[in-house]
Amino acid sequence: MLGARTGGARIEVSRCIAASLKCQTACEAGMARLKAQGVAADDDAVRLLRQCAELCELNVRALQKESRLSRRTASLCFELGSQVARAAWLEAQDPDSHALARDALHLARACRPLVFAA
């Protein structure tokens, strides 16, 4: 057993994978909403969502492969998920933004046990 599974239970890995997939979908939907509103692709909000979606995808692959780097990707998801949740909540103007904030916070909480596992 490598990476996150060394110190984390299988259920924690499964939760982190599920939360990563859900957050990836939410971030991609958020990017589409911003694009539809005319926000430029190089805008900070769009870049943050793109980074989060890409990192979520990488995290899922690392955890599924039991990669040595999976603890690092989970750590980055914890960190970036917290940033996305905060940004989405502070700038929330609609239910979709609140849902994005919820999904990103769920990602951070789901990945946290893998980051701080012994």
Located regions from the model:
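Amphipathic alpha-helical hairpins
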Residues: 1-118
